[in-house]
Amino acid sequence: MEKILRGKVIIKGIIHTLTGLYIGGSKETMEIGAIDSPVLRDAVTGEPYIPGSSLKGKMRALLERTIAGKDPNFKIDRNIGTGRNVVKIHVCDTKEQAAKCEVCRVFGSSGSKEGTNFPSRIRIRDAYFEPYTKKKLEAAETDFLFSEVKYENAIDRITAAANPRQIERVPAGSDFGFEIIYDVEEIADLSTDVENIAMLLQLIEDDYIGGNGSRGYGKVLFYLNYCVAKKIDAYKELTGSKYEKVVLQCEKEIKDETDYKDLCTIDTLKGKIAEVTKFFKEG
């Protein structure tokens, strides 16, 4: 089966952290005697960031669990982990199955045999600090540049001995700019797929991003400032042509962390899905 690209839906906004955020980096980049769990940082700027793969993986996992709760035949049985670290996901065996699966057609499927891969329809960019957040943290007296250290104790349930540890995290109140691009391949799937994307962002708001979520880390809110639907012919024309439609846009320039309150919520995006679908159906 051939995958036809009919256009793209681009969603941009801000990830606002309500609690400290931990997405782990390599300990090899830290000096001897440093903290136990460092955050992931950009190799050039040293800024912590949220990898697109982390957000995509979280969204996929939540959608799998959502569908599994409704469909007893939906299996989450493909192990992509290594050694004793078992990580199971749902993967359709064929392209035909993947094209009908709400998980695999959006997030991709590797199939079970050569030639059965179904590439993802979604692209999620790495999320970096908003300029005002970077400026604020550069001036803040934190433990490290752009981050803080949280001290925790793990208690041995038998001996009651304490095992102290240090976890680096991005402070609460930090804002990251994010971007999600959805490839429009089948117009019949468009409404369901974008509805699922919006639903998953709301689920994450009541869940967490990164590690240590059960201990309060990674609570976030999503605010949107832009959404555009672009037919494939829009890439041949000047910006603002009849082949693209901006369905959501924040007119106010975001200069500090108070301005995000003027942005749109995920519910606003949900209210625009019918408009996006109609735009692509018009041909």
Q: Residue locations for each model-derived region?
A:
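RNA-binding basic/glycine-rich loop and surface signature characteristic of RAMP-family CRISPR effectors
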Residues: M1-G283
